[in-house]
Amino acid sequence: MKKLFLLYAICLLAFPTMGQNSEYIDLGLSSGTLWKSVNEEDFYNHSTAMKKFGNQLPEKQHFVELKKECQWIWKDNYGYKVIGPNGNSILLPAAGSRSFNGNLTNVGTHGFYWSSTLDGSVQAWGLGIISNAVTIINYYTPSCLSVRLIQK
């Protein structure tokens, strides 16, 4: 029962409900980029994410800046609280990913986020989070990952 409740809580954090108001948060980053306060509702492959969100997807450089300029605090079974230079924060949930067969994997332990930056013809850069690491890494573009939008 505890695991079921935990999974439900993670899903609530990772997937906003329809019509929920969300805002863009100023973390005080040197670029002036604002980060949306919540993830988009679903997991997306790279092509679909690009078509649906376009220039609202962060570029690789935005993840590099976020990693470099912010303080990252792991919240057990939830993800990272990311605190900007000005003290404002966002939560990047460890929402896992959706496998090719449609199953959710790594919920509560890993988070994977697309950038708009391609790395060759079948990979794109993204942000990967686990309890002891935040990495900028390339992912296979058909993978279904989380999306966190920005405002430039």
Where are each of the predicted segments found?
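C-terminal, surface-exposed recognition/capping segments
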Residues: 20-23, 27-29, 33-50, 54-152
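Sec-dependent N-terminal signal peptides
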Residues: 4-15
